[in-house]
């Protein structure tokens, strides 16, 4: 979660997951935004850093497998504003796969690992996430 330029809260998919797991932890994240002097975030554990790195490696390997299969892939880069505009353009262009798309509908916003156009439907996309889990399943 973060405060946008208008000082409004914006929630990510990870924030929603955190709220489901622990409303208190989510509340503490919000307190950290408005009172960073009283709500200090713990340093990530080695285990959590390993899980995150493994997720990033998995995402990169999956992206490479899509490239190797010659899929039409649009890779989005840049800040939220640019990424949002580029995502809408890629959807308008009916790109098959959009990597690191940025979607927003206030008060929610976030990056999707992959938007994948449904077969036989030029305007409908599925969101595929490769690393939202915070622990092994």
Placement of each model-derived feature along the sequence:
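Metal-dependent nuclease catalytic cores that hydrolyze phosphodiester bonds in DNA/RNA
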Residues: 1-121
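A conserved hydrophobic secondary-structure block that centers on an alpha-helix together
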Residues: 121-137
